[in-house]
Amino acid sequence: MKKDILERLETEIKACKRYAENSIKKSREGNIGSAINLLDVAGTAKKCADQLHEELWKESQGNLNEEEFELFSESETLDRELKKAYKELNIARQR
């Protein structure tokens, strides 16, 4: 169960980061519609990662090895990725 949660969490983290990065690229290109769509997917991936973050904590009862803790911690930084993408989208909208 724990291994499954870790794999799913890693997938959602990667998806959130990838879609947020691609949203930033589309914003810089002036393709607002695509940037919004990509940012929406990134936000959904973050929500899934948040749920898995909580599941992992409950399943492990706070006993995580170093590798698991790194992944656990990385999921807590996804807000920054989304904020960067939102900022770039707002800049693109003002052009």
Regions found by a protein language model. Give the residues of each.
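Long, low-complexity or tandemly repetitive, helically biased scaffold regions used
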Residues: 2-95
